[in-house]
C-alpha cells in the first residue's frame, strides 16, 4: 500500500527476493581485513555471502565451481597470489561464469598482465583494484578494462591526500619526489592504549586530522595517484630507496615467472642489494638475463635485482601476503 514495494506472499517469493542483489564470494580467509570487510558490507546491504567448499586452502576448481553453482556476481581475491592459480583453473575447465560481474583485488597488488588475462577469459567482468588498510579502511580504487589495465595507479578523490616527507604540509598535484599517502574524513580514534603510535599514524596537519598507514606515493599533475609501496619493505641500495613491490611487479611481468618476492641483503658495494626470490611457471627455464631484460622495461636499471634465487614455492600467509622475513632469509643464504 501507499505505493511501497510489493511484499512477498509466499515462501518461494521470499527466497527469490532474498537471493537477488549482491552475491559475494570473498575467497580469502575472514581473518583478513578484505575478507571480513566485504562480508560485512554484503550483509549490511542485504546481499548474500557465499563461502567455497574448501575455505582452508586456495582451490581454484572449488572457487570457480562455487561461483558457477551459486551464481556469485562478485569475487574477492588478494593480488597475484590468488590470481595465478585462479587463472590456471580457468584454463583447465570450461564453466558458465556469465553471472560474475566484478572481481575485486585487495590486500596486495594485482599485476596488469594478470588483469588482462582475466579480461581475455571474461571480457564483461569489471576488474577492480582496491587499496586500504586496517588504520584507514578502504582508500583507493581503480577499474580496469581490456587493453588499458595498469597497476599501482589510482584516480584521486577528495578524501585522499599526499603529505610531505616530514608530515608538515599537504603536497599539491605535480609535486617533486614522493610523499605519504594519507586520508581525511571519518577516521578511527587510534590505537587502544598506544598514544605515541596514534600520534604518528593519525597526525594533525594545519588543523586537519589524517591517517597515514605507511604507503609512499606521488600525486601526478593529471590527478592520478601513483602508489610506490610500503615504506616498511623498502630497500636502501647505493643511497636510493627501492620499493620491493615495484621490483616484484617488474619481475612478474615476465611470462615465465609464476610468483616473486623481493628482499634486501647486505652488500659491501651498495650497503644493501636487491634480491628477487622467484618461482617459475612449471616447465619454464629462462635465464637470469631474460628476467632482468623484461624487468628493465618497467623500472629503472638501478632497481634491478643483483641476484635471482629460484625456489619451488613462495611462502605466503593464508591471505596471500608475502612473508618478507622468509624472503630476507632466503636472500641472505643464497
Question: Where are the predicted features?
Answer:
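Short, well-ordered beta-strand segments
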Residues: 23-25, 181-182, 277
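Short hydrophobic "strand-cap" motifs at the C-terminus of beta-strands
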Residues: 27-28, 52, 78, 105-106, ...
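Conserved AMP-binding/adenylate-forming
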Residues: 68, 101-130, 134-225, 230-234, ...
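Hydrophobic/anchoring residues in structured secondary elements
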Residues: 102-105, 262, 309-310
